[in-house]
Amino acid sequence: MGESPASVVLNASGGLFSLKMETLESELTCPICLELFEDPLLLPCAHSLCFSCAHRILVSSCSSGESIEPITAFQCPTCRYVISLNHRGLDGLKRNVTLQNIIDRFQKASVSGPNSPSESRRERTYRPTTAMSSERIACQFCEQDPPRDAVKTCITCEVSYCDRCLRATHPNKKPFTSHRLVEPVPDTHLRGITCLDHENEKVNMYCVSDDQLICALCKLVGRHRDHQVASLNDRFEKLKQTLEMNLTNLVKRNSELENQMAKLIQICQQVEVNTAMHEAKLMEECDELVEIIQQRKQMIAVKIKETKVMKLRKLAQQVANCRQCLERSTVLINQAEHILKENDQARFLQSAKNIAERVAMATASSQVLIPDINFNDAFENFALDFSREKKLLEGLDYLTAPNPPSIREELCTASHDTITVHWISDDEFSISSYELQYTIFTGQANFISKSWCSWGLWPEIRKCKEAVSCSRLAGAPRGLYNSVDSWMIVPNIKQNHYTVHGLQSGTRYIFIVKAINQAGSRNSEPTRLKTNSQPFKLDPKMTHKKLKISNDGLQMEKDESSLKKSHTPERFSGTGCYGAAGNIFIDSGCHYWEVVMGSSTWYAIGIAYKSAPKNEWIGKNASSWVFSRCNSNFVVRHNNKEMLVDVPPHLKRLGVLLDYDNNMLSFYDPANSLHLHTFDVTFILPVCPTFTIWNKSLMILSGLPAPDFIDYPERQECNCRPQESPYVSGMKTCH
């Protein structure tokens, strides 16, 4: 049920009364002891001070054992006014009787009851301490053992009492009615912190100069009197806020460290797993090598045995043949020696003729009778040389990812739609292939944080974990180029160079080369390369009849005698503007060209939509933007509005930078590396380079790379003056 209106009004009035009483109590508090004034003195400066507190001030100013009688002055603790004392000392000061009466009435109004303003304030003051103290607090006045539990703590007495002792020691009469009673608190929290220099004083302010807790006497008469001090509450709030902020940062840092430690532990576990896998793989590979060696050993041993058997068989046959020949020769020799012993000539002649023929025949045919024997075939030409294999075995090691290649920017070349990238690597023998990755340079957005990819620099397709683009990789078209977001990938390159075709003209690209082998891959540092601008020539079909175009289509000259050209809707036809246009329409990329004006003093150079009027000077409509000169005046013009441009003297060449993608058209003085002006244009149609002259000639240099002093797409200061051209009203004379 809701409260009655009377109780609501009563509660509201009670709260208002409590607020007023709290405010009054702060006015009745001594600045030294921070308690209600007791026997207050009225100082000449109109402030008040407890008699005992004033006495402590005088005592603190004396040396040890010295009397306070010689002291004739002290400072007011509130306003620092010097209070002079007569021969009576403190007794010579007036008592503030009115203040004492107010304090007595205030104490009567705040006696007993938790809703009294003083009680509420005291409870709030000690509530945090009470909340923190959940232990049992015993009565400090009980004589029995063990003492009873305390029900109240007297702040004035600095003692905790049980209910019986509280009634006995604090009757409802003066001076006990002014004692502050709170819920029981530990004695350590009750007494608070005392001053280091004044042992009987509690700290109640903070010295900022010394970064130290002090009491009021330290500020009045102590060594902190000239120091900057602050209230405990202000210092408490400031330090608490700082500590909370630092604690928040520390907790955040700890959380980050915990995450990093978890990742490190995960990596350690992965190292253990990978190490075990590599060790098992090592044993497997070495066992296979040992098996291969054993097999080759057995095979070579068999071959040696077979060769031995074959050679011994052949030699045994040769020995048998030699033995047979030897036996035959021995028989013939014996027969011949026997005939030679015959002394009878007739018998000798009869027998020797046959023997002599046989010996002569045996001697003549000795080469035929003795078999062909190879004495060098002793199995000496066979050798076992495993030195090459030993070196290979000695070089056995685990394969690591190749060193990152390096793009040779000085060797790279470009046209308006191609870039040839060259790179080198000091680890070519361990590289199985290269992979070329490239994308249009858009600034720091090309470099993705680790939250996208575990390798920090996108793309590392093979080892990417959390990149959102990985879901698109599965559906990417197969072929030479695989697109992941805006990156293009050219895989399986075997050479140290590659030419990329089909690029945008005048555009910067980021290139990364990845060296790959079975152990992994490593990227080169990203390199920025840019294509040249789109080359163009002057289109004869759009050229004014009174202009002459050179054979190479790069120079235009005023020629009054050239009137043979037929009129077409595309041709410039104004009577005061002799215009020409390039033979291209640009709808993307960044393009740069230069125009050599020579001695021409009347011209306009810029761009225009195809729909721009052909019978007036370019820049006088909303479809064209130009840089123009009329004699000594240089202006930029669009939609018939002009601004003067400060141009260096003798401007002979003008640089034009069209950044279609960033909606900018800029003009430069390339000879002095000076930026002249930039148009901010929201292009909605393709644009065409456009030129108009009134005298002399112009020459176009197209397909150029942007000079190094132009760091597009950053904006540069221009030399325009935002005021009307002095000859705007007389524009007809220029046209």
Curated annotation (Swiss-Prot):
The keyword Transit peptide does not apply. Phosphorylated on serine and threonine residues. A zinc finger (RING-type) spans 30-80. Residues 233-301 form a coiled coil. InterPro entries: B30.2/SPRY, B30.2/SPRY_sf, Bbox_C, Butyrophylin_SPRY, ConA-like_dom_sf, COS_domain, E3_ligase_FN3/SPRY, FN3_dom. It catalyses: S-ubiquitinyl-[E2 ubiquitin-conjugating enzyme]-L-cysteine + [acceptor protein]-L-lysine = [E2 ubiquitin-conjugating enzyme]-L-cysteine + N(6)-ubiquitinyl-[acceptor protein]-L-lysine. Its EC number is 2.3.2.27. Keywords: Coiled coil, Cytoplasm, Cytoskeleton, Disease variant, Intellectual disability, Metal-binding, Microtubule, Phosphoprotein, Repeat, Transferase, Ubl conjugation pathway, Zinc, Zinc-finger. One of its GO terms (molecular function) is microtubule binding. Its main location: cytoplasm. Pathway: Protein modification; protein ubiquitination. Transmembrane segments: none annotated. GO terms for biological process: host-mediated suppression of symbiont invasion; innate immune response; negative regulation of viral transcription; positive regulation of autophagy; positive regulation of canonical NF-kappaB signal transduction; positive regulation of DNA-binding transcription factor activity; positive regulation of NF-kappaB transcription factor activity; protein localization to microtubule. Residues 340-399 form the COS domain. It is found in: Cytoplasm; Cytoplasm, Cytoskeleton. Residues 516-709 form the B30.2/SPRY domain. One of its GO terms (cellular component) is extracellular exosome. The keyword Kinase does not apply. E3 ubiquitin ligase that plays a role in microtubule stabilization. Mediates the 'Lys-48'-linked polyubiquitination of LRRK2 to drive its localization to microtubules and its proteasomal degradation in neurons. This ubiquitination inhibits LRRK2 kinase activation by RAB29. It is linked to Intellectual developmental disorder, X-linked 101: A disorder characterized by significantly below average general intellectual functioning associated with impairments in adaptive behavior and manifested during the developmental period. Intellectual deficiency is the only primary symptom of non-syndromic X-linked forms, while syndromic forms present with associated physical, neurological and/or psychiatric manifestations. XLID101 clinical features include global developmental delay, hyperactivity often with aggressive outbursts, and seizures in some patients. This is Probable E3 ubiquitin-protein ligase MID2. It comes from Homo sapiens (Human). The gene is MID2.
